[in-house]
Structure formats: structure tokens, C-alpha cells
């Protein structure tokens, strides 16, 4: 067993380097040692890589969608998590205190005394720990939250638990999509596709997906996953087309686009009176030019911000993965080892001409 393990560290915008760390050892703040099988890459990883999310917490080991095998675990942590050495688990992003009023009320995603995170910014005392998924091993705090997932599912499929959890939660829990709903999904990335899949699963009436001209393959997959119509926003007027297809507007609009502002304005126009808008695409803390809040009032719209995924979203996603009902392998387009992490991120960002990725995974064992 190696004494040193490798991890990819981000030191600044578009700056990554390989470093070696001591293999984690069980202790008061290390409840388990995880051998990382795979870690998904999403749009926020891209923005973090570019520097759009600021320098807070750097240097850090990115990777907030890790999946792996527990190699060592303390008795106390095993009892808390309900798992044992040899189990495969999906790891949640945040490490809550588990004792503040918010945690005790079930709102641990908004913990007042957060210990840190997996793959995001951490306090100084945790910055030298193997906390992110772009590593061969991870140091899991006893307060981390994990979800068991079957070992016989290919790792590159099982690791989709995060985007699938987001799609399920944002469409069904926040959006309230149900039998007969008309739904607009703006953004045909992995979370958009997951939202389409979830909406179709519960019997949505009409599902419309939007994307850019370069998203042709994603939009084709959106139709395979259940979208009735797709809109190329580079060539068509989203609002006009939605109104044409729905006789006035959709019940639910989901904006899952990173940084783009126009989808928010389109959602307000394209959603029917009394409908719901779910905003999940981060915009880099920028103001939205042209936003008219009177329209929200006059149309009696409900607007919800969708922050990450919670335990129910993860558990529903894992049930979906384990069911084998869906051709999830069609979403999984690329997998790379640690030496090629930057290439993987640039691919997902659309920065590599001729290459298009949907779900891209880092596989430290490759």
C-alpha cells in the first residue's frame, strides 16, 4: 500500500498541478479513507477552473462529485453512516456540523457552522487534506454525508448520481412537475438531460428543451430522453416558439444554463400566468440586464432558487441508476485519468474544437 497518493490541485485561474500527499490515516477528523473510483465534472467545475468563482479557498483539490470504495472506517463512523469497509458510496459536497438549529431542522445544506466541503473551498486547517475527488484517495470527515450504491454498476455510470439528483430535485421538488405538466428545460447539459428524464418519468405532458447550435448532439439526446421539442436558441426565438407549442406558455421553466442571462428573461416571458420558474444556473454574481420584476408580479409567478442537491435528491438518483431503466450510458461520453484533468475540463467547457462532452468523469485509477 502506497504511503503517498496523487491529487490534482488548483492554485489559480486555469492553473493546476499534480501534488503528492500522505495517504489518509484514521483519526478524530478522518472518519473514513475512500479510494476514489470516479469523480464527475460539471459546469461549476468549469467556472471554478476559469476563475469565475473567485480565489477563495485556493489552493484546493477540486472534484465535488466523488464516488469510491471505503477502504478504512472507524467504528463510530461506520455506525453513523450505516456502511462498512468495502462498500461503495457517493459522497455529498458539504460537511455540516450536524448540531446547529438548521442541521437539526433538516436544513443541513444551509449549516451555520459548516466544517468544509468536498471539492470546494475549505478553511485553512483543511486545505492540506485530501478533500476533493480529483485524487486517488479522499479523507472523509465523520460528519460527511454518504450514500451507498451497488458495486456492480460501472463506476462511470454510478458517478452520475450528482447530476441526476439535481435534475430530479430541481424538476420535481422545486418545479413541481407532475402528470400533464408542460415544461421548458433551458440548457441541454447533463443536469438538463436529467431534468428531462425525471419529467418524462412522472408523466409530464409536453417537454421542451433548449440549447445552442453547438449542442446538436445534446439536443438529439434530449429527444431520446423524453423531450417532445427542441429549440436551437441561436436560430430560433425561444419565447415565440414556446408560446406556439404550448398555446400561451409552460407550467414550469427550469434555467440550468451557466452564466447566460437571456434564459432568465426568456423564462419570465415563456411561463404561463401562475407558473413556476426554477433558477439553478449560476450567473457569476452579475446583475441581470433588462429584468422587469413587474412581470413576475403581474403574472403571479413563483421563482425558486435551486441550491445544489440534498439527501432526497441523491437517494432518488441512486434508485434511478440502480433500476437500470434508462440508457444512462448515452450521457457518459468521456473519462480521463488524473494526468488529463485539465483536458477533461476544457472538453466539457467546449474549448476543444471537434470534441463535445456531456458527462465527463475523472477516473483516478486510469
Which residue ranges define each predicted feature?
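Short, well-ordered loop/turn sites that connect or cap secondary structure elements
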Residues: 81-83, 177, 271
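NAD(P)H dinucleotide-binding glycine-rich loop of Rossmann-like/cofactor-binding domains
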Residues: 97-186
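Glycine-rich beta-strand-centered segment in the early N-terminal region that forms part
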Residues: 22-39, 53-104, 150-152
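Glycine-rich phosphate-binding loop and adjacent beta-alpha segment
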Residues: 204, 217-223, 228, 260-323, ...
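Short Gly/Pro-enriched turn/cap motifs at secondary-structure boundaries
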Residues: 11, 23-24, 57-63, 125-131, ...
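Mid-domain Rossmann-like dinucleotide-binding core that forms the NAD(H)/NADP(H) cofactor-binding site
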Residues: 86, 136, 150-236, 240
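N-terminal Rossmann-like NAD(P) cofactor-binding module of classical short-chain dehydrogenase/reductase
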Residues: 254
Amino acid at each position: 500500500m502506497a504511503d503517498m497518493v496523487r491529487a490534482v490541485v488548483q492554485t489559480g485561474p486555469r492553473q493546476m498541478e499534480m501534488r503528492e500527499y500522505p495517504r489518509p490515516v484514521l483519526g478524530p477528523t478522518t472518519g473514513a479513507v475512500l479510494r476514489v473510483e470516479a469523480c464527475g465534472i460539471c459546469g461549476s467545475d468549469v467556472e471554478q477552473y476559469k476563475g469565475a468563482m473567485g480565489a477563495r479557498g485556493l489552493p484546493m483539490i477540486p472534484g465535488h462529485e466523488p464516488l469510491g470504495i471505503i477502504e478504512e472506517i472507524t467504528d463510530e463512523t461506520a455506525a453513523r453512516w450505516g456502511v462498512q469497509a468495502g462498500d461503495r458510496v457517493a459522497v455529498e459536497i458539504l460537511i455540516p456540523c450536524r448540531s446547529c438549529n438548521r442541521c437539526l431542522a433538516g436544513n443541513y445544506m444551509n449549516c451555520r457552522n459548516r466544517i468544509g466541503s468536498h471539492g470546494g473551498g475549505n478553511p485553512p486547517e483543511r486545505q492540506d487534506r485530501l478533500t476533493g475527488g480529483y485524487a486517488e484517495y479522499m479523507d472523509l470527515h465523520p460528519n460527511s454525508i454518504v450514500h451507498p450504491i451497488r458495486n456492480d454498476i460501472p463506476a462511470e455510470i454510478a458517478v452520475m448520481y450528482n447530476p441526476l439528483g439535481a435534475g430530479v430535485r430541481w424538476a420535481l421538488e422545486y418545479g413541481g412537475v407532475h402528470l400533464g405538466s408542460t415544461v421548458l428545460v433551458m440548457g441541454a447539459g447533463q443536469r438538463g438531460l436529467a431534468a428531462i428524464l425525471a419529467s418524462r418519468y412522472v408523466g409530464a405532458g409536453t417537454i421542451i428543451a433548449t440549447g445552442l447550435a453547438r449542442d446538436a448532439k445534446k439536443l438529439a439526446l434530449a429527444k431520446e430522453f423524453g423531450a417532445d421539442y427542441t429549440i436551437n436558441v441561436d436560430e430560433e426565438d425561444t419565447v415565440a416558439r414556446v408560446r406556439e407549442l404550448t398555446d400561451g406558455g409552460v407550467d414550469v421553466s427550469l434555467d440550468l444554463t451557466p452564466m447566460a442571462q437571456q434564459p432568465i428573461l426568456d423564462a419570465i416571458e415563456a411561463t404561463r400566468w401562475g407558473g413556476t420558474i426554477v433558477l439553478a444556473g449560476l450567473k457569476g454574481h452579475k446583475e441581470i440586464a433588462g429584468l422587469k420584476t413587474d412581470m413576475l408580479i403581474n403574472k403571479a409567478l413563483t421563482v425558486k432558487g435551486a441550491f445544489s442537491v440534498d439527501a432526497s435528491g441523491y437517494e432518488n438518483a441512486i434508485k434511478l441508476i440502480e433500476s437500470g431503466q434508462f440508457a444512462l450510458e448515452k450521457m457518459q461520453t468521456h473519462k480521463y485519468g488524473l494526468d488529463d484533468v485539465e483536458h477533461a475540463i476544457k472538453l466539457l467547457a467546449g474549448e476543444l474544437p471537434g470534441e463535445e462532452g456531456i458527462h465527463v468523469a475523472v477516473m483516478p485509477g486510469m
